[in-house]
UniProtKB/Swiss-Prot annotation:
UniProt cross-references to Pfam families, sorted A to Z: SBP_bac_1
Top-level lineage group: Archaea
SUPFAM superfamilies named in the record: Periplasmic binding protein-like II
Protein name stated in the entry: Maltotriose-binding protein
InterPro entries (alphabetical): Maltose/Cyclodextrin-bd, SBP, SBP_1_CS
Family label: Belongs to the bacterial solute-binding protein 1 family.
Gene name as annotated: malE
Length: 453
């Protein structure tokens, strides 16, 4: 997405900043899904602190010349106020769609209010009864906002038929501790970006990927088999491929000492790292691909602008499955989801629900967001639309989202990132001889201590 829903998490080595606006949450220079700290990757979970000034209100009753969407709208009445921190280009598209809805539902008024410091504005206004009906941000706020009583449950509106319209990761993103608080409209994760001049078709299995890495690994000429930033966010795909995890949102426990997680880490450092440049940072790895010194890069939608600027003829595809002992294991990278949340004490819940349901389940709306803004759809049927399938970026990342592991929603995840990164940094001191199992178990204990206070 435009600057990606990209979160920057730095706890110890990472911080929670936010991998979506271009980002998942709003649109500041930051996004909200949590990812490792890199200037090119996700930005921050916390909007940069600025004083909230008088809200900029935008209300329109006159439809613009946008395509007429055929899905019938359920109509409420009265005003629905939506707080956001979107960029101007995003806001323009959202307003256009809202105007279309208002043309079908003349008794409702949709008002967008810009909040530069959205999180703090919500934390002050909602308890005072002065909050919005809705607000837009990434799913990573759902845990801490629900715990603080800042969200309005919408359980009475949720049906199984509705949930099945969305990708599995998106369905999971809108629920916290048995209650639903939002509906999803876009997502983000990492995938393979491949140089078609070097590799005409993406590898379909990990064995095929390994053949490509072996073929093009030529360190004496500064050429490598793959470009892949090494940090907690980016290698989550392999670390979690065999059923392991950094953190279980349901039990709220870390999982670095799980056999499946250990297997994932070992697989990465035994089967991928040997074909990489020894410098693991984001900028170096991306530059290797942009300079044509690697056939494939693992990265997110936020990197596509740089890939295009480099003049590379590229494609996007999910990381391929690992076939082991006759079983297929799909890499499961972390992903984030953009949501429209219901604020606690919403003043016009029924009208807000009808608008949000229309907005998030109308295929033409989601298609327009994808084509105009580069948002990755989570409405499953849109991924089969011919225009979407013909867009290599949207379709490729959309397929990757189907295998993504949702970024944890619990506030306790904050204690996990630093421990995971610490383990990775220790392994990188000597990847060939590192006792990966012992290192992961060591940092499991460190995370548990940090979680306890």
């Amino acid at each position: 997405m435009k600057r990606g829903i990209y979160a920057v998490l730095l706890v110890g080595v990472l911080i929670f900043s936010v991998v979506a606006s271009g980002c998942i949450g709003g649109t500041q220079t930051q996004t909200e899904t949590q990812t490792p700290e890199k200037t090119q990757t996700p930005t921050t979970t916390q909007p940069s602190p600025t004083t909230t000034t008088s809200p900029t209100q935008t209300t329109s009753q006159t439809p613009t010349e946008t395509e007429t969407h055929t899905q019938e709208a359920e109509c409420g009445s009265g005003k629905v106020v939506i707080w956001h921190n979107m960029q101007p280009n995003e806001l323009q598209v959202f307003q256009s769609l809202a105007e279309e809805y208002m043309a079908m539902c003349p008794d409702v008024e949709i008002v967008f209010e810009q909040k530069p410091d959205l999180e703090n504005a919500l934390k002050v206004a909602i308890p005072a009864g002065q909050g919005p009906d809705l607000f837009i941000w990434a799913h990573d706020w759902i845990g801490k906002f629900a715990e603080a009583g800042l969200l309005e449950p919408i359980d009475e509106y949720i049906t199984d038929d509705l949930l099945q319209k969305f990708a599995p990761m998106a369905r999971e993103a809108i629920e916290y501790k048995g209650h639903y608080y939002a509906l999803p409209f876009a997502a983000e994760t990492v995938a393979m970006i491949y140089n078609k001049k070097i590799v005409s078709e993406p590898p379909k299995t990990f064995d095929e990927l390994k053949e490509v890495m072996e073929k093009y690994y030529d360190p004496n000429n500064e050429k490598y088999g793959i470009a892949w930033p090494i940090n907690a966010y980016f290698i989550s795909a392999i670390a979690q491929a065999f059923g392991g995890y950094y953190f279980d949102d349901k039990t709220e426990q870390p999982g670095l000492d799980k056999p499946e997680t250990i297997e994932g880490f070992k697989f990465f450092f035994e089967n991928i790292w040997p074909y990489m440049a020894p410098t693991a940072d984001y900028n170096t790895q991306q530059s290797i691909f942009l300079e044509g010194r690697a056939p494939i890069m693992v990265n997110g939608p936020w990197s596509i602008g740089s890939v295009k600027d480099a003049g590379i003829d590229f494609g996007v595809a999910p990381l391929p499955p690992i076939i082991k002992d006759g079983k297929e294991y799909w890499p499961r990278p972390y992903g984030g989801v953009k949501l429209i949340y219901f604020a606690a004490g919403t003043h016009n819940k029924d009208a807000a629900w009808k608008f949000v349901k229309w907005f998030t389940t109308n295929p033409e709306v989601i298609k327009q967001l994808a084509l105009d803004l580069g948002y990755i759809p989570v409405l499953s049927e849109v991924l089969n639309d011919p225009e979407i399938k013909n867009d290599p970026v949207i379709y490729g990342f959309g397929q990757a989202v189907q295998h993504a592991y949702l970024m944890p929603k619990s506030p306790k995840m904050g204690a996990v990132w630093g421990g995971v990164q610490g383990a990775i940094d220790e392994i990188l001191k000597d990847p060939k001889h590192a006792d990966i199992e012992a290192i992961l178990k060591k940092y499991q204990e460190e995370i548990l201590k940090n979680m306890q206070g």
